[in-house]
Amino acid sequence: MSRALEPAEPILSAEGTPYSPRYDDVYHSTEGGLAQAHYVFLGGNGLPQAWAGRDQFVIVETGFGQGLNFLATWQAWRNDPQRCRRLHFVSIEKHPFTREGLAQLHAGLADMLPLAQQLQAAWPDALPGLHRLAFEDGGVTLTLALGDIEAVLPKLVAGADAFYLDGFSPSRNADMWSPLVFRGLARLARPGATLATYTAAGFVRRGLREAGFDARKAPGFGGKRDMTVATFCPVWKSRRHAPTPAPEWKVRHAIVIGAGLAGCAVTERLASRGWQVTLFDVHDGPARQTSSHRAAAMHAHISSDDSLLSRLSRAGNQYALRAWAALAGAGQPVGWHGCGVLQIGENEAEAEAQRAALEALGLPESFVRWMSPGEAASQHGAGVPRGGLWFPQGGWVAPPDICSAQLRRAGDAVQSRFGTRVERIRRRDDEWEAIDEDGAVLASAPILVLANAHEAPRLAPMRHQVMRRVRGQLTTLAPGQVTALGSWPDCVVTGAGYLLPVSEDGSARVGSSYEADDGPLVARTEVHAANLDRLAGLLPQAAAAAGNLDAAAMSGYVGVRTVSHNRLPLIGQMPDEAAAIAAAPSLRGAHLRDIPRVPGLYAALAYASRGLTWAALGAELLASQIEGDPLPLEADLVDAIDPARLLLRALRHGQVGREEGHSSGLSG
């Protein structure tokens, strides 16, 4: 389970240097934090010269502190005409400052204050896990890994070109300087990666050497005689999967099939990295199927053990909010209504379980807290039968508005081919071809992304990616019906069903069914009646009035969700099932990174009821995988949504054989 984070306090020493009473040490030399950053970390890694002319450069730091190393590196990047196209800065921090604490410590930064204020504005809540923050229109990306280094470092997926080791003194914080950490850094190091640190402790150099670094002394900063610099050049091969250089794409062009939440998000993320995208959808515009409904809610999942779903949904919610804010900042608002979400238990036992989970997790109240029935009624007009989890950052939005904003943001980088059906796809000469029913090639590109939900198995072999169709029906209450029900909440309320606040036209929505897709997508009276029962359970004072409404006269929305075997999405590079089956005996003890993959073919599928949660983060994950960037999720979370996960399980259990592995069906 993820541990609750304990934020650092902005305390100064007698000399005016930021100080940690927890470690009884200062955050940087009394000679000055920025001067130390330039001398030790940039200079010790040969920056900015080392990134000159590069497409991508990745720095991994241990100990973010007040962020001076990041700010100094960002400023150096801005000032360098030979800078790399994209700078990635990945930093681990166990005790992050709050936004207010950073502002206090940054107050005297003078000409760097504008950058510091951008960092403060983007600063996340103290939630364990990875937080990706983008600056300079994506040219500079900060990925904060919040948590204990011994837990976080093994889960990072990145290829590092340089390391900043900036933990507190080894004598005060030994966990940051252990052999486990040094081996973890070596796992991430690209060939020739450099390293610098303020410390000159002999055991640090010895530990780095044992991990494959050529570590040596260098003249220290200020009054310190020595520091340590290193280069990764192991004399033996000990890594099963070594980081590789970022791919050098001759042509940045991708085909995306499906223009719902998944496909539009992928299109925008690829366009932000300089890709041209040809977007296909059989309908006459974006968000015409499952993503077409005019109101969808989003909040995180909470569990006492901080399960994979809980961690994924937390990451997805946080990234989505940042992504939508960035769209709004670029003049493309998505219409997000951050009214908050109240999630109540279906009964008192479930409510007690919610409270116990909340207490066990220790998450900040800015993310989730307990709300009593009295507070829900007085503050939000929600006459709920019991207390529940209050998500102040939750809310609702119209998915089509997100899709439209993303495509507008992509601009000329996207060629939308609406009303066009891709009949099949084919791999030829290192490119993917989208082909119509007459056999004509509609487009070709080195990358193809399947974002077309339950239609995907029609285009690619997916024997081991189990998906099913689940019907969902929302009920729309007309303005007069809402008035007849009495007080209506100004927030989203969820439990055994959900209801949304009143829309601008005075209507409100209640949902939703979750049933097998067994017929035409038309509204059913009995489902409207069931939704009214759900409403009565959420707002007991409205039960009598709801019982008087005529379900047969109701209108609403009907759609189909695409759901995986465990309700987690399928996001990542597609497995080559034929190759894996042919090599089945050798893959009995395999890991996901051992599974053969189809070159250039990716999936963004099975978002089920959490399209708002998965779409933006899933798109950033895919774009990062394609570009060879550090991933925005921990390795175990990436594995949890990998399209090859069921194939891996079948291989491990000996449940596949050569008789399955004929043609992949993707060439010819």
From Swiss-Prot:
**Which Pfam families does the record associate with it?**
DAO (PF01266), Methyltransf_30 (PF05430)
Subcellular location, principal: cytoplasm
Q: Which residues form a coiled coil?
A: none
Q: What GO biological process term is on the record, naming one? A: methylation
The record's subcellular locations are: Cytoplasm
Output the superkingdom of the source species: Bacteria
Look up the EC number in the record and give it: 2.1.1.61, 1.5.-.-
Region feature FAD-dependent cmnm(5)s(2)U34 oxidoreductase, mapped onto this chain: 257-668
Q: Which cofactor does it need?
A: FAD
Q: Which UniProt keywords apply?
A: Cytoplasm, FAD, Flavoprotein, Methyltransferase, Multifunctional enzyme, Oxidoreductase, S-adenosyl-L-methionine, Transferase, tRNA processing
Q: Which InterPro entries does the record cross-reference, listed alphabetically?
A: FAD-dep_OxRdtase (IPR006076), FAD/NAD-bd_sf (IPR036188), MnmC-like_methylTransf (IPR008471), SAM-dependent_MTases_sf (IPR029063), tRNA_MAMT_biosynth_bifunc_MnmC (IPR023032), tRNA_MNMC2 (IPR047785), tRNA_S-uridine_synth_MnmC_C (IPR017610)
Gene3D superfamilies given for it?
A: D-Amino Acid Oxidase, subunit A, domain 2, FAD/NAD(P)-binding domain, Vaccinia Virus protein VP39
Please give the GO cellular component terms listed in this UniProt entry.
cytoplasm
Which stretches does the entry tag as region tRNA (mnm(5)s(2)U34)-methyltransferase? 1-233
Query: Which reaction equations make up its catalytic activity?
Result: 5-aminomethyl-2-thiouridine(34) in tRNA + S-adenosyl-L-methionine = 5-methylaminomethyl-2-thiouridine(34) in tRNA + S-adenosyl-L-homocysteine + H(+)
Record GO terms (molecular function): flavin adenine dinucleotide binding; oxidoreductase activity, acting on the CH-NH group of donors; tRNA (5-methylaminomethyl-2-thiouridylate)(34)-methyltransferase activity
Free-text function comment from the UniProt entry: Catalyzes the last two steps in the biosynthesis of 5-methylaminomethyl-2-thiouridine (mnm(5)s(2)U) at the wobble position (U34) in tRNA. Catalyzes the FAD-dependent demodification of cmnm(5)s(2)U34 to nm(5)s(2)U34, followed by the transfer of a methyl group from S-adenosyl-L-methionine to nm(5)s(2)U34, to form mnm(5)s(2)U34.
The record's comment on protein family reads: In the N-terminal section; belongs to the methyltransferase superfamily. tRNA (mnm(5)s(2)U34)-methyltransferase family. In the C-terminal section; belongs to the DAO family.
Q: Which NCBIfam families match?
A: MnmC_Cterm (TIGR03197), PRK01747.1-2 (NF002481), PRK01747.1-4 (NF002483), tRNA_MNMC2 (NF033855)
Know the name of this protein?
tRNA 5-methylaminomethyl-2-thiouridine biosynthesis bifunctional protein MnmC
Q: Which organism is it from?
A: Cupriavidus pinatubonensis (strain JMP 134 / LMG 1197) (Cupriavidus necator (strain JMP 134))
